[in-house]
């Protein structure tokens, strides 16, 4: 008939709906391992291809990494006789150092270039196990974390020249620094990684606040010790350990931390307006939360149909009532005298043994 779905279309619609349920999206462990193997293989393949391409363009990448050192004045760079005053050559002192430097630069660049592929594979493997709101929040936090890491790495690259100039300026009096290319590359790599990860700390604080683990009031009460610990952290983790690099890392972290406090304060106001505060939010950190078992919902009582009920052993029918069809009085009981109740004919009464006592007399 027109307007009605055909059986094939109806079955296809049902199958499409069933594939979207949680039960049908579950897979055995072997399927998960097989999917993980395939996604890891794709990520490694993308990394290998990016590594080959980056190895070809390694001289340009190395010139970009060497630019902060080349921006220093000639008085702070080692320029032996026969080289121009504006030369910024880095040196290596081992047989395999030149190849190691090129390989290290290619691998670092390959990780960055292939990051969209392996991040997508990681996201596709984790996403099926998340709910819709968890996917939304996780996607937001992943995007923000990538932006913060890239911002920290760029900020570290911009401050490399000033930090190097300050450190190499302590030479003089016949002391000239001859930079090893391998050590210089390790220094740049450590600075980019430390600044990028340090810029993620405010995001971690904001996640703890949104999860309800810590409130903004608690964080504000600890503000002075937290700022002090931030600068101590900046002084310890920076490879150069000079005051400029410490301030270059500590001040942005404090600024981002204040931004995280503002976002947490707005979240606390939203939660308080909705009335979603925890009943244990006012408890002290050392105080145990009470266990209340009175709020547990009562268990529903088991019910049975009226036709399947029968008198329990040792009881008799109420006055004026009769046994239901197909039932009999329990052994050892009888209907009360004068109640007018009787067992219907053919109701299937249970046989009475000779030793059973009956109300009308004993059967011998």
UniProtKB/Swiss-Prot annotation:
UniProt lists compositionally biased (Low complexity) regions at: 301-320
Give the compositionally biased regions (Acidic residues).
Answer: 282-295
Q: Where is the composition biased (Polar residues)?
A: 324-344
Q: Name one Pfam family in it.
A: TatC
Show the stretches that span the lipid bilayer.
42-62, 107-127, 139-159, 160-180, 194-214, 225-245, 246-266
Q: Name one GO molecular function term.
A: proton motive force dependent protein transmembrane transporter activity
Chain residue ranges for the region called Disordered: 277-364
Where it sits in the cell: the answer is: Cell membrane
InterPro entries from the entry?
TatC (IPR002033)
Q: Does the keyword Disulfide bond apply?
A: no
Q: Keywords in alphabetical order, please.
A: Cell membrane, Membrane, Protein transport, Translocation, Transmembrane, Transmembrane helix, Transport
Under the cellular component aspect of Gene Ontology, which terms does the record hold?
Answer: TAT protein transport complex
Q: GO biological process: what's one of them? A: intracellular protein transmembrane transport
Q: In what way does this protein cross or attach to the membrane?
A: Multi-pass membrane protein
What family is reported? Belongs to the TatC family.
What does the UniProt record say this protein does?
Answer: Part of the twin-arginine translocation (Tat) system that transports large folded proteins containing a characteristic twin-arginine motif in their signal peptide across membranes. Together with TatB, TatC is part of a receptor directly interacting with Tat signal peptides.
Q: How does it assemble?
A: The Tat system comprises two distinct complexes: a TatABC complex, containing multiple copies of TatA, TatB and TatC subunits, and a separate TatA complex, containing only TatA subunits. Substrates initially bind to the TatABC complex, which probably triggers association of the separate TatA complex to form the active translocon.
What's the protein called, per UniProt? Sec-independent protein translocase protein TatC
**Gene that specifies this protein:** tatC
């Amino acid at each position: 008939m027109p307007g009605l779905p055909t059986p094939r279309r109806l079955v296809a619609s049902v199958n499409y709906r069933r594939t979207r349920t949680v039960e049908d999206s579950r897979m055995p462990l072997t399927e998960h391992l097989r999917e993980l193997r395939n996604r890891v293989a794709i990520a490694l393949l993308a990394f290998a291809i990016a590594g080959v391409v980056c190895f070809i363009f390694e001289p340009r990448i190395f010139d970009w990494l060497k630019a902060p050192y080349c921006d220093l004045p000639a008085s702070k760079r080692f320029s032996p006789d026969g080289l121009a005053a504006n030369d910024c050559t880095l040196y290596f002192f081992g047989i395999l150092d030149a190849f190691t430097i090129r390989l290290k630069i290619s691998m670092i660049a390959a990780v960055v270039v292939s990051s969209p592929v392996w991040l997508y594979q990681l996201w596709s493997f984790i996403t099926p196990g998340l709910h819709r709101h968890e996917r939304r929040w996780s996607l937001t936090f992943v995007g923000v974390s990538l932006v913060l890491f890239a911002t920290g790495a760029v900020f570290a690259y911009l401050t490399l020249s000033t930090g190097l100039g300050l450190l190499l300026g302590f030479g003089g009096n016949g002391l000239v620094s001859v930079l090893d290319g391998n050590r210089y590359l390790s220094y740049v790599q450590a600075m980019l990684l430390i600044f990028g990860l340090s810029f993620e700390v405010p995001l971690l604080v904001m996640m703890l606040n949104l999860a309800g683990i810590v409130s903004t009031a608690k964080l504000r009460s600890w503000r002075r010790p937290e700022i002090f610990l931030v600068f101590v952290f900046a002084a310890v983790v920076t490879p150069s350990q000079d005051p400029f690099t410490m301030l270059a890392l500590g001040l942005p972290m404090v600024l981002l931390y204040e931004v995280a406090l503002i976002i947490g304060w707005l979240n606390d106001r939203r939660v308080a307006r909705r009335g979603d505060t925890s009943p244990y939010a006012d408890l002290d950190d050392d105080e145990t939360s009470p266990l209340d078992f009175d709020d547990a919902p009562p268990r529903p009582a088991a019910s049975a149909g009226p036709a399947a009920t029968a008198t329990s052993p040792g009881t008799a029918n109420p006055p004026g009532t009769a046994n239901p069809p197909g039932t009999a009085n329990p052994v050892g009981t009888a209907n009360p005298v004068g109640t007018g109740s009787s067992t219907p004919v053919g109701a299937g009464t249970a046989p009475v043994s000779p030793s059973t006592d009956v109300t009308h007399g004993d059967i011998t």
